[in-house]
């Protein structure tokens, strides 16, 4: 895919715009497996898709520098090309939601980006969207303005430097509304909280982060156990990254 643009949107967090025919097949919640453009890094890097523009065959990826491979991605500029596998994963189930429904989005840190496309598509259908975001501090806050285009947004920070002090549970535990669906992505602690809080919700989903090797389900490097069945496992890359709450052990 061709690099259209790239900018640093927060300290060590970059937004990368790619263009190519692959965009036509993309869905909210899927990810791309990017090859680092050098000979020293053999493993691809999985990066979630934050927004999709099929009309212009473009997609946006937001990632954090977390090692030498992603540091190399941050040096890419307009006109460069990337070896990309994808789109991969199952994505979020957004079916059967319309103006009669209310949905909760919960994101934390670098797990926020895949929720942007979800919010956009649901808003286009008239769904009422409520978003709760959690970050470490004010410098880490991303996509609040973009998500606010599609509904009400609450922001929490661990140190209270922006928004409400605490984590997302401070807001969620006080929400009186009933939600027809819940979509979430974030750090392991946040995902455990969502998994427990919405354990019996029929349409609550977790988008899980995991280190991957092959990205195609063959190597079993990203497996999760299934509740009450030690012999069954789920692969984050192939069976996920989106799972219904209560269906995997976190």
UniProtKB/Swiss-Prot annotation:
HAMAP family of this UniProt entry? DHODB_Fe_S_bind
PANTHER family from the xrefs?
DIHYDROOROTATE DEHYDROGENASE B (NAD(+)), ELECTRON TRANSFER SUBUNIT, DIHYDROOROTATE DEHYDROGENASE B (NAD(+)), ELECTRON TRANSFER SUBUNIT-RELATED
Q: Does the keyword Flavoprotein apply?
A: yes
Recorded name of the encoding gene: pyrK
Q: Which domain of life is it from?
A: Bacteria
Q: What is this protein called?
A: Dihydroorotate dehydrogenase B (NAD(+)), electron transfer subunit
| Membrane-traversing stretches | none
- Subunit info? Heterotetramer of 2 PyrK and 2 PyrD type B subunits.
PROSITE patterns linked: FAD_FR (PS51384)
């Amino acid at each position: 895919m061709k690099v259209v643009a790239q900018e640093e949107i927060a300290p060590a967090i970059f937004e990368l715009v790619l263009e190519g025919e692959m965009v036509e097949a993309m869905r909210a919640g899927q990810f791309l497996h990017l090859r680092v453009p050098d000979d020293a890094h053999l493993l691809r890097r999985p990066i979630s898709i934050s927004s999709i523009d099929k009309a212009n065959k473009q997609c946006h990826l937001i990632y954090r520098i977390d090692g030498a491979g992603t540091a190399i991605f941050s040096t890419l500029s307009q006109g460069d090309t990337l070896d990309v596998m994808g789109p991969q994963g199952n994505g979020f189930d957004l079916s059967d939601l319309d103006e009669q429904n209310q949905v909760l989005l919960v994101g934390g840190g670098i797990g926020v980006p895949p929720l942007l496309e979800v919010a956009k598509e649901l808003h286009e259908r008239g769904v009422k969207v409520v978003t709760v975001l959690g970050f470490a501090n004010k410098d880490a806050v991303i996509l609040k303005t973009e998500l606010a285009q599609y509904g009400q947004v609450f922001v929490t920070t661990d140190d209270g430097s922006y928004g409400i002090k605490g984590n997302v549970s401070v807001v969620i535990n006080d929400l009186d509304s009933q939600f027809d669906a819940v979509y979430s992505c974030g750090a392991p602690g946040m995902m455990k909280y969502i998994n427990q809080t919405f354990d019996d919700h029929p349409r609550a989903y977790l988008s899980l982060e995991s280190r991957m090797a092959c990205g195609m389900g063959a190597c079993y490097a990203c497996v999760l156990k299934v509740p009450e069945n030690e012999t069954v496992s789920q692969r984050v890359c192939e069976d996920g990254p989106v799972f219904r709450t209560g269906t995997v052990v976190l």
